[in-house]
A protein has these predicted regions:
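Glycine-rich, mobile lid/loop segments that gate access to catalytic sites or pores
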Residues: 113-223
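Short acidic, glycine/tyrosine-flanked loop/strand segments centered on an H-E-D-like triad
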Residues: 98-124, 308-326
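A short glycine/serine-rich beta->alpha loop
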Residues: 10-15, 118-130, 217-221, 278-281, ...
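Glycine-rich, N-terminal phosphate-binding loop and its surrounding beta-alpha-beta segment
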Residues: 44-103, 107-109
Length: 362
C-alpha cells in the first residue's frame, strides 16, 4: 500500500484499525531536538476517540510508545518509530460487511485492489484511526517548527450548513477553545448540527481552515515540487478529505485579476503583500505571508440509516444497516490531523532549503 510520504522527510504509516497496534516511522528528522512528550500527548488527545458526545463512543488512550529514534529524550538522527496499541476493538461488528461493501467506504475498492485479502475490521488500513500516527509525526514537526517561530493552527470553518464567518488570522484567537471556532454562537449551532445528525442516525461533514504563520519566503519549488503539491498530498492522506484549496481557492475563479492580485509593499524593511488571496504561495514557492488552506471533509459514511448495497458473493442487491461505533461528524477530531499534515509538509520544505545542519537545535 502507498502509505509512505517520501521527501527530505520520510514518513511511513503502518497498522490497521483493529490490529494489535498502529504506528509511524519518521526518517530525516534533525538530531538533537528535545521532544516534549507532555505537549505531544495533549496534541494526540485532541484527535483521540471517545472524548466527547460529538464523537465515536470507542475509547482509546492513544499513548505513543517510542521504539527507537530518541536518546535522552532527544532525536538522535536514527529513524524514529512509535506505535499506539489498539486496546478497544470489536471486530465482530464488521463480520457482516466482508461480503457487503458499505456505501461511501473503501470496502469495495479494497476488495477489487487486494482480492479479498484486505483487513475489513474497522476499515483496516483505510481507517481514520491511521491519522493517530500521522499526528505523532506532525506533532513532533510542529514542535520543531514552533522553536523556529513557525506556528500552525486550524479551526472549524463549517459543519454542514453552519459557517463561522469570522476571519481567521492565526492561533491567538483560538487559545483555550475546546471546540476550535472563532464565533462561539456559530460553534454552538455546529455542535447542535452534529447532535441532530446523530439523533437521525445520519452524519454530517464540514470544512477545516488552517493557517501557518511566520513561514520563510522561498520554500518550495515550481510545478511538481510546489508547496501546494506537498500540502495537498499530505492533506489527502486524511481519509475523509475530498477537497483542498489555498488562499481564495475556488473563489478566485469568480474574481477579476485586479481583485485577486495581492499588491506588494514594504513593511518593517521586508516585502509583504497587502492581501493574501494567494494563500502565501506563488509559483509553488512561499511568499513569506501566512499559508492559508482549507480541507473539505465528507460526512462519515458509516451511518445507522438503511442503505442499498450489493452482496459480492451472491451478486444480489441487499439492504445494509451499519453496526459499530462511529463519529456523526469527523471534523472536530480532524482539526489536529490537518495541523499535522501541514507541519510535515512545511518542515520537509525547510529541510530542503536549509538542510538538517541549518535547522539545528543543539
Amino acid at each position: 500500500m502507498s502509505s509512505v510520504y517520501t521527501g527530505n522527510l520520510t514518513v511511513a504509516i503502518f497498522g490497521q484499525s483493529h490490529a494489535p497496534a498502529i504506528g509511524v516511522t519518521i526518517d530525516g528528522l534533525p538530531a538533537g531536538f528535545p521532544v516534549d512528550m507532555d505537549a505531544l500527548s495533549r496534541f494526540l488527545a485532541r484527535r483521540a476517540p471517545g472524548g466527547s458526545p460529538l464523537s465515536t463512543p470507542r475509547r482509546e488512550a492513544d499513548a505513543p510508545e517510542f521504539l527507537c529514534g530518541l536518546s535522552g529524550g532527544r532525536t538522535c538522527g536514527a529513524p524514529l518509530t512509535a506505535i499506539i496499541r489498539n486496546t478497544n476493538t470489536r471486530s465482530q461488528d464488521y463480520d457482516a460487511l466482508r461480503a457487503v461493501p458499505r456505501p461511501g467506504h473503501a470496502d469495495y475498492t479494497a476488495q477489487i485492489k487486494y482480492g479479498g485479502y484486505q483487513d475489513a475490521a474497522g476499515g483496516g488500513h483505510f481507517s481514520g484511526r491511521l491519522t493517530a500516527p500521522l499526528c505523532i509525526a506532525g506533532g513532533i514537526c510542529m514542535q520543531m517548527l514552533a522553536q523556529k517561530g513557525t506556528v500552525i493552527a486550524a479551526r472549524i470553518l463549517s459543519v454542514g450548513s453552519v459557517t463561522d464567518e469570522t476571519p481567521f488570522d492565526g492561533p491567538a484567537a483560538l487559545q483555550g477553545r475546546a471546540f476550535p471556532v472563532l464565533d462561539e454562537a456559530a460553534g454552538a449551532r455546529m455542535q447542535q448540527e452534529i447532535l441532530n445528525a446523530r439523533a437521525a442516525g445520519d452524519s454530517v461533514g464540514g470544512v477545516i481552515e488552517c493557517v501557518v504563520s511566520s513561514v520563510p519566503a522561498g520554500l518550495g519549488a515550481p510545478m511538481f515540487g510546489g508547496m501546494e503539491n506537498r500540502l495537498a498530498q499530505l492533506l489527502f492522506a486524511i481519509p475523509a478529505v475530498k477537497g483542498v484549496e489555498f488562499g481564495a481557492g475556488f473563489g478566485a475563479a469568480r474574481l477579476r485579476g485586479s481583485e485577486n492580485n495581492d499588491p506588494f509593499a514594504i513593511q518593517n524593511g521586508r516585502v509583504v503583500t497587502t492581501g493574501n488571496h494567494a494563500g502565501g504561495i506563488l509559483g509553488g514557492i512561499t511568499t513569506g505571508m501566512p499559508l492559508v488552506m482549507r480541507a473539505a471533509f465528507k460526512p462519515t459514511p458509516s451511518i445507522a440509516l438503511p442503505q442499498q448495497s450489493v452482496n459480492l458473493e451472491t451478486k444480489t442487491q441487499t439492504e445494509l444497516r451499519v453496526q459499530g461505533r462511529h463519529d456523526p461528524c469527523i471534523v472536530p477530531r480532524a482539526v489536529p490531523c490537518v495541523e499535522a499534515a501541514a507541519a510535515v509538509a512545511v518542515l520537509d520544505a525547510m529541510l530542503e532549503s536549509y538542510g538538517t545542519e541549518g535547522l539545528s537545535w543543539t
